Amino acid sequence: MTSAAGPSARAPVDALDCRILLLLLTEPGIGVLGASRRLGVARGTVQARLDRLQRTGVLRSMAPDVDPAAIGYPVTAFCTLEIRQGRGGHSPVVDHLAAIPEVLEAHTITGSGDVLIRIVGRDNADLQRVIDRVVDDAHVTRASTVISLATRLDHRTIPLVEHLLDTSS
């Protein structure tokens, strides 16, 4: 689980770190040796930078990015949950949500709800099954769901790293 980190929690990232990150984001299979050759730096330098970026939480994963639609879950929805307030905060609800494979993300939010989740289903009927399972928790008092018709801008970090590289020079 990750939390929102403030500016003081920012790990120092320099221009070489940004170049390494951009290379991995645009060519995920390049590997350390290929990256070192492409960037013109020693293999050990790239490996040390990657180790530090992982250790400091900048690079969260080297895992492949799986498209839920490509594995049979083409319907995406976002649910805003209102949570019964009490001891333990959101922990019991988060534990409940973590047990549901179709819940891809959960975020504590401000505004009209308490938790925003992203869920997937095989079709609308399956999505309803997932929603029913989500709200089948005593701590969830209300849920509001919107179905995504199309993803116009997918999760992305390349422009952010490019901006960081441009401003770090």
Tell me the role of every PLM-derived stretch:
Residues M1-S169:
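A compositional/biophysical signature of low hydrophobicity enriched in polar/charged and small residues
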